[in-house]
Swiss-Prot record:
Thiolesterase that catalyzes the hydrolysis of S-D-lactoyl-glutathione to form glutathione and D-lactic acid. Binds 2 Zn(2+) ions per subunit. Keywords: Hydrolase, Metal-binding, Zinc. SUPFAM superfamilies: Metallo-hydrolase/oxidoreductase. InterPro entries: Clx_II_MBL (IPR035680), Glyoxalase_II_hydrolase (IPR050110), HAGH_C (IPR032282), Hydroxyacylglutathione_Hdrlase (IPR017782), Metallo-B-lactamas (IPR001279), RibonucZ/Hydroxyglut_hydro (IPR036866). This is Hydroxyacylglutathione hydrolase. Gene3D superfamilies: Ribonuclease Z/Hydroxyacylglutathione hydrolase-like (3.60.15.10). Monomer. It comes from the Bacteria. It comes from Blochmanniella floridana.
Amino acid sequence: MNIIKCISLQTNYIWIIYNHIRQCIIIDPGESLKVIKMLNHLQLIPEAILLTHNHRDHTNGVFTLIQHFPKIKIYGPIETQNQNFATITVSEGDTLQILNQEIKVLNFPGHTPHHIGFYYKSWLFSGDTIFSAGCGTIQTGYTQAMYKSLLKIQCLPKNTLIYSGHEYTLLNLNFAISILPQDTLIINYLKKITKVLKKNKLLQPTTLQLELKINPFLRCNDINIQKSLNLFPKPGEEWKILQALRNKKDLYLVKN
């Protein structure tokens, strides 16, 4: 199986997986025009669309894709049922049989109430749950759910490749340094990424092994982060660190 990316709406990633006979799966098509052009250019035949959640920047392309490819099947969480297309509802415990491959569904509530991810071999399509050095915004009342979702990701094999829904790496690393200004690994990685982007090279995917080191949202038990926030939660309340980090990140985005 091969994977290619389609840049959409400035920061969105649409992922396309295809096999040796040019059949493909499209993940989170936020628009259709670029996807159709790419499919035509590579002579790919779409068999399925996978949706991680119901936000329009991940689903806007579905209706037009259905018109072009009427036999295509759409899989997504229950929250995608309210859109203008029919979806096969899936959740954790389901294994999709597509292109003679098995794709596992994982529940990642937090960014939205019924957000899901798709796990294929060592590839995780995480939607807006986790980004390189960051995580998605959290719906009100779902901080603890998001914390558990991030814990679930941390328990995956360390060689997992993470294909997320947006490219925010540079911004996320700068925020991480504002929390951990002495973290040499994050500082050096920011320098590396800055050079890559200056050469107009695209990023993604990242690895879980790397994210465990550079992503503050995966380090809620880290005493250095707790000191930076001046917040020392009781055992079992580490989600409060996630909440504090996300609040700071939201303010950081407003200022930057």
